[in-house]
Amino acid sequence: MLLEQIGQPLQLRELPMPQPGPGEVRVRVLACGVCRTDLHVVDGELPEAPLPIIPGHEIVGLVDALGEGVTGFEPGQRVGIPWLGHTCGTCSYCQHAEENLCDAPQFTGYTRPGGYAEYVVADARFAFALGEEGDPVALAPLLCAGLIGWRSLVKAGDGKRLGLYGFGAAAHIVMQVARWQGRDVYAFSRPGDVAAQDFARSLGAVWAGDSGELPPVPLDAAIIYAPAGGLRRHPHERYPELSLRHPLAGARGGLGGQSHPPGRPGVLSGGRPGRYPYRNPRLPAGAGQPGTG
């Protein structure tokens, strides 16, 4: 499915079979999720998309061919491909395990071809081995919100009492993983967002409330899934405005990346640690559009 014009429906096209270059793998796509970022690409809300482009970055598939120098993968192995598709490896961010802030990144489904296709080529450094179990459709969202949440959770340490500020896609996955790890999770939502608070409790939150409230006990760690914008030290002084490279990574250090692979068994290896069932609508290739406007 090809985006040929910004804001227009994707077009079903027959394209040449992509060939993996050095350090790349070709993957036969089993499933690819639809993320809000795909809508941003289609609607032109992310700048300078190199049209035509194949969107899609929540990809689950089988390794089909290996480029020169690739090790650690074999044909037929199931892998996941996320949004962050390539980094330079040499800038200061890459050298300090913050490759999601790379000075010269490439993004799957935006600046390199994505997963709304039968085959996709990926940088092998940013392809994650998956287990044999698990529905590809259920696993696909873990390649975006799941990775953002996982990296944030790793950085938060091993504290027993964990706070989640903002309860959206990434946080609801982190909730399930953290509960599976035996942690007590405290969820904070926008003031008055009773639905989000009820959802958090249904996933095992020991407490849920407004972001302006104090939790009933001190927290060992907290993850803040906040939108890009200003930070305040106190009511009369502002930090400079923050302009994140891609605001979909609400928590700093999101987007996954090779320095924080999802290595915990059951997280991206085919198991579902949580008890909330995924309810992802399924569309055959070419049958649906990510939507515009």
What are these regions (language model features)?
Residues 5, 16-17, 51-56, 108-112, ...:
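Short Gly/Pro-enriched turn/cap motifs at secondary-structure boundaries
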Residues 79, 132-213:
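Mid-domain Rossmann-like dinucleotide-binding core that forms the NAD(H)/NADP(H) cofactor-binding site
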Residues 87-165, 191:
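NAD(P)H dinucleotide-binding glycine-rich loop of Rossmann-like/cofactor-binding domains
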Residues 16-32, 45-92, 126, 131-134:
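Glycine-rich beta-strand-centered segment in the early N-terminal region that forms part
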Residues 156, 186, 194-254:
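Glycine-rich cofactor phosphate-binding loops and adjacent beta1-alpha1 units
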Residues 261-293:
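C-terminal hydrophobic helical "lid"/dimerization subdomain
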Residues 37-39:
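Cytochrome P450 core scaffold surrounding the K-helix E-X-X-R motif
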